Amino acid sequence: MLLVAALHAIEVAMFMDEKSIASIDQAKEAALRILLHNAHGQFQGLPRTAGWGYPEPYTRDLMISALGFLATGNEELADALRRTLVALAENQTARGLIPSLAHDPDDRGASDTTPLFLFGLALYRKSANLPEFLNQAAQSALKWMQYQSPDDRVMVSQLPTSDWRDEQWVMGYGLYVNTLVYAYLKLYGEHESAGQLRELMNRLEVCGEAKNPHEHEGLVVPSKPYYALYSYKVLNSDRFDLLGNSLAILTGIASPERARDLVAWIEAECEAMRARGELAVDLPSCLFPYILPHHADWHPRYEIYNRPGDYHNGGVWPFICGFYVAACVAVGRMDLANRKLLALTELVKPWHENEAEWGFNEWIHAQTGQPSGRDWQTWSAAMYLYAVQCVQRQDTPFFGDMRPGDLNR
């Protein structure tokens, strides 16, 4: 252990000066303060989604934040996760669907809340050594998810605007939601189903009219290392989804070789975007290329909420960048992971609506680098802390056992 710690100290020193290390420490302290501030909200005492703008306990935000909650080792945050899981189980529908708000059983219709509940519950069980915690709710949720596969072959489908991107069109077999399905299948020991899903996702995406009607859609983009945004029958989008692809790396859906190529491709594409003035920061946009008004997949409503480089149409989201830092660690690119962590530390500093020393904003405008969402966002703070732990430990807690042995744990 002493040797590992010494080697880590040497590696950190190679990439970070004292000022950078101090800045990360300050950001860690601020992130923890934000999470503790948000741990008790006005809705049944459940955690807030943000310090100001979002007082509600949004399921997806809090389940994603489980990674950061548990990474801190803080008992109050672990209890906040436990209370949220209990509330979700109590408000689960009779058939197993998990609502979008932890306190409101009638806020339904999301495609990612049930797989995220299963994911967050598995993390809590492992951390607390409670393998049977909320078992009835887990079994009901697993059953619900089985019926979300249109052809009864594990891969699940979704309706547009039903996942975390409530202002973006993703339909059919979406990458992000299916990476969550793969993750919970691995965590719950459903290895046969997980293997089947991984095989399906790694098939070539079939485009055009000549598709064999008996061939299942895949998500691999021909001649590219990344996975498509979505695919369903003759419809698909080969735009790049940073969250989905980062999860594909972390979970081991991507082979070690593909994962390394994918990270290299992301960096090359982002460098080209910066050269064109499309990206102002040293972190990737959540989606690219951006959807423009003359593109076939543009929707009139995007002019209001989803302009190019904004929000779900290429905004830079700190919580997603936390996953990307972890993905860099997963492929063994510690030099890159350190650099991206420093960039993320700079990204979470500015505030937008509420003056604070550290903003931990919701999302950042890609072309200007200016914060544009809500400050003190729970998942922004939580995933920052998770990213820091990944870099400092040089592994990816909770994900390592999902990946093939030759991909860095």
What are these regions (language model features)?
Residues T59-L88, Y124, G244-P256, V325-M334, ...:
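Alpha-helical support elements that line or immediately flank enzyme active sites
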Residues Y173-M201, G315-W351:
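Extended amphipathic alpha-helical segments enriched in small hydrophobics
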Residues A66-L70, A80-R83, D112-A141, Y384:
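Substrate-binding cleft of carbohydrate-active enzyme catalytic domains
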Residues L67-A71, F119-K126, A183-E190, L250, ...:
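Short glycine/serine- and small hydrophobic-enriched flexible loop segments
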Residues F15-E56, R83-D107, Y147-G172, N202-V316, ...:
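Extended glycan-interaction surfaces of carbohydrate-active proteins
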Residues A78-R82, N135, G195, R260-V263, ...:
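Conserved positions within tetratricopeptide repeat
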